[in-house]
């Protein structure tokens, strides 16, 4: 039986048990029109599907695996920790050890942290904490930035630039009066003037402003110079708390997260992915004056049976220790530069209407002449052409994140051989997509 038929049957079996055959929707690969691979095993920079085909992996569990699949140190930690128990439901030594390592990396003083199991839990609770701390009931987020699938983070009002002066009316109409159910205002990403105008009108009622320091969940969209800094400065002018969502960017470009490359300082910061090293770990942290509003010291509720799971905590510490190794980030940046340079050269030389945008080892291909700066420009990209490109890449055993509005990732263990092969595949696929081959 041909492989494609076997693969179809396997996916059909998955669909018997899971809605859409998956436990997270993007895994269905619908935006790129491929049958989703079903993984059998993974090692370093590759995974093998259930029919033995090998793929070079540039998704890396959506950026979690900066150290690749099955790093020996992480595997050792998992085995050693599991031998001491899999879950306690009590505070463990491993939690304390990871917290100490985390604060040492970030160079924070007078802060406290709460560990949870997912980025959604972390951002959801951070918003709840901000509302209770300030006693206010408006949250501002930016269009195209994803902060998890809690209701408070999915719902919202999209404010058009031409309707900016209608904001007070909208707020009064939809204001719930419940500090735990804030009104969600959504503003355009990268437009500091609109943000300033909105804050001038409703700033004294804003509990928090949540943002990605580098937008990742509409593809890699870089902030304009001064945008993030301006958001933080203006927010503080109105005593609104800032929540910096570093679930993806945290520890990706430096051991202090984006603070390694940007002069930013939020009130609450959220981490995940790399922090867990492939295990379900996320965290939110802030100055103790804010964090002590959480139960059992304060009145803000958060709980989780598996929060601070001892195995996950041990792996998290191992992940951070690997990131702290000498020249870890310079080596990763050099790897990225040498990998992307030939591809960028071909795009420029051929005049392809493609923008390869990267932030360190995170990257996206946008099928448009210039890099997008907001969601509207991302939506204007030629997603159909991206799908054609993606299918050429996938057919040759390279797995990018399967959507035009998602980021892909390099790891520290991508081999020179696999990177050289992938360079050729990406260039070949671009040429085929635009009919140059």
Curated annotation (Swiss-Prot):
Catalytic EC class: isomerase
Cofactor(s) required for function per UniProt: pyridoxal 5'-phosphate
Keyword terms of this UniProt record: Cytoplasm, Isomerase, Porphyrin biosynthesis, Pyridoxal phosphate
Residues with N6-(pyridoxal phosphate)lysine modification: 273
Example GO biological process: protoporphyrinogen IX biosynthetic process
UniProt key word Isomerase: yes
EC number(s) per entry: 5.4.3.8
Subcellular location: Cytoplasm
Keyword hit for Cytoplasm: yes
UniProt GO molecular function: glutamate-1-semialdehyde 2,1-aminomutase activity; pyridoxal phosphate binding; transaminase activity
Similarity annotation: Belongs to the class-III pyridoxal-phosphate-dependent aminotransferase family. HemL subfamily.
Protein name (database record): Glutamate-1-semialdehyde 2,1-aminomutase
């Amino acid at each position: 039986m041909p492989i494609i038929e076997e693969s179809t049957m396997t996916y059909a079996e998955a669909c018997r048990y899971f809605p859409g055959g998956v436990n997270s929707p993007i895994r269905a690969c619908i935006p790129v029109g491929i049958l989703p691979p079903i993984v059998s095993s993974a090692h370093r920079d590759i995974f093998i599907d259930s029919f033995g085909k090998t793929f070079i992996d540039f998704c890396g569990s959506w950026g979690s695996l900066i150290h690749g699949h099955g790093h020996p140190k992480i595997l050792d930690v998992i085995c050693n920790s599991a031998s001491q128990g899999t879950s306690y439901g009590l505070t463990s030594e491993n939690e304390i050890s990871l917290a100490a390592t985390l604060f040492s990396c970030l160079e924070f003083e007078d802060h406290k942290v709460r560990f949870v199991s997912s980025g959604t839990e972390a951002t959801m609770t951070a918003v709840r904490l901000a509302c209770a701390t300030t006693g206010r009931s408006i949250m501002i987020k930016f269009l195209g930035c994803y902060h998890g699938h809690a209701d408070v983070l999915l719902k919202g009002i999209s404010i058009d630039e031409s309707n900016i002066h209608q904001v007070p009316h909208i707020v009064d109409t939809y204001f719930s009066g419940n500090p735990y159910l804030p009104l969600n205002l959504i503003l355009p990403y990268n437009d500091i003037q609109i943000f300033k105008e909105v804050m001038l009108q409703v700033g004294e009622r804003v509990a928090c402003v949540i943002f990605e320091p580098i937008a990742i969940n509409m593809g890699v969209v870089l902030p304009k110079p001064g945008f993030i800094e301006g958001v933080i400065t203006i927010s503080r002018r109105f005593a609104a708390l800032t929540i910096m969502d570093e679930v993806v960017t945290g520890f990706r470009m430096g051991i202090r997260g984006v603070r390694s490359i940007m002069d930013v300082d939020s009130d609450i910061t959220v981490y995940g992915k790399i922090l867990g090293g492939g295990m379900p770990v996320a965290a939110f942290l802030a100055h103790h004056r804010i964090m002590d509003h959480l139960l059992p010291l304060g009145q803000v509720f958060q709980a989780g049976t598996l929060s601070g799971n001892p195995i996950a905590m041990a792996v998290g510490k191992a992940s951070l220790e690997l990131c702290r190794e000498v020249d870890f980030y310079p080596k990763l940046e050099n790897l990225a530069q040498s990998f992307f340079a030939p591809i960028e050269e071909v795009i420029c030389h051929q005049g392809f209407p493609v923008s390869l945008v990267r932030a360190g080892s995170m990257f996206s291909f946008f099928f448009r002449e210039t890099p997008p700066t907001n969601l509207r420009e991302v939506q204007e990209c030629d997603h159909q052409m991206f799908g054609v490109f993606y299918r050429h890449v996938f057919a040759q055993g390279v797995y990018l994140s399967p959507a035009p509005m998602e980021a892909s990732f390099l790891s520290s263990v991508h081999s020179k051989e696999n990177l050289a092969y992938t360079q050729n595949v990406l260039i070949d696929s671009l040429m085929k997509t635009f009919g140059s081959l």
